């Protein structure tokens, strides 16, 4: 426990919280252009082909972002909107692409959780 005099000389240091999504620089979403669309395999106990896109953002960052839902229409030069949110079994993927905005189509035949996948209400 420091004395009052020691605290006057050198005050306590506040811990600095490190951002989990640095490329968004405090914005909820960011726009970017796909530079590469590919599939990756997840970490050890899981097995699949996860759809991922490399995106160059408007602020110059280049990040890997996950394409959620079944099927997508993305290719190189597609303009996408990304949000934060990591994929636990894909190391280095810390962002999600927002479905149903800009060049990203919503998921076809989606009945539940439609707002998360940019799907319109079925007739």
UniProtKB/Swiss-Prot annotation:
Record-level Gene Ontology MF annotations: rRNA binding; structural constituent of ribosome; tRNA binding
Superkingdom field: Bacteria
Amino-acid biosynthesis found in the keyword field: no
Example GO BP: translation
Region Disordered: start-end pairs: 1-26, 104-123
Keyword tags: Methylation, Ribonucleoprotein, Ribosomal protein, RNA-binding, rRNA-binding, tRNA-binding
InterPro entries, sorted: NA-bd_OB-fold, Ribosomal_uS12, Ribosomal_uS12_bac
One term under GO cellular component: small ribosomal subunit
The keyword Acetylation appears for this protein: no
Basic residues compositional bias, start-end: 108-123
Pfam families registered for this protein in UniProt: Ribosom_S12_S23
Modified-residue entries (3-methylthioaspartic acid), positions: 89
Family annotation (PANTHER family): 30S RIBOSOMAL PROTEIN S12 FAMILY MEMBER (PTHR11652)
NCBIfam families documented for this protein: rpsL_bact
Quaternary organization: Part of the 30S ribosomal subunit. Contacts proteins S8 and S17. May interact with IF1 in the 30S initiation complex.
Protein family per UniProt: Belongs to the universal ribosomal protein uS12 family.
Function: With S4 and S5 plays an important role in translational accuracy. Interacts with and stabilizes bases of the 16S rRNA that are involved in tRNA selection in the A site and with the mRNA backbone. Located at the interface of the 30S and 50S subunits, it traverses the body of the 30S subunit contacting proteins on the other side and probably holding the rRNA structure together. The combined cluster of proteins S8, S12 and S17 appears to hold together the shoulder and platform of the 30S subunit.
Name this polypeptide is given: Small ribosomal subunit protein uS12
Gene name tied to this protein: rpsL
């Amino acid at each position: 426990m420091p004395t009052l005099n020691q605290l006057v000389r050198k005050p306590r240091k506040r811990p600095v919280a490190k951002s989990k999504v640095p490329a968004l620089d405090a914005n909820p979403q960011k726009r970017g252009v796909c530079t590469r669309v590919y599939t990756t395999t997840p970490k050890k106990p899981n097995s699949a082909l996860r759809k991922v896109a490399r995106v160059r953002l408007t602020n110059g960052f280049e990040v890997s972002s996950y394409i959620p839902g079944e099927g997508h229409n993305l290719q190189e030069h597609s303009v996408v909107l990304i949000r934060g949110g990591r994929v636990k079994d894909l190391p280095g993927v810390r962002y999600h692409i927002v479905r149903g905005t800009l060049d990203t189509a919503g998921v076809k035949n989606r009945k539940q959780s439609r707002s998360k996948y940019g799907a319109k209400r079925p007739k």
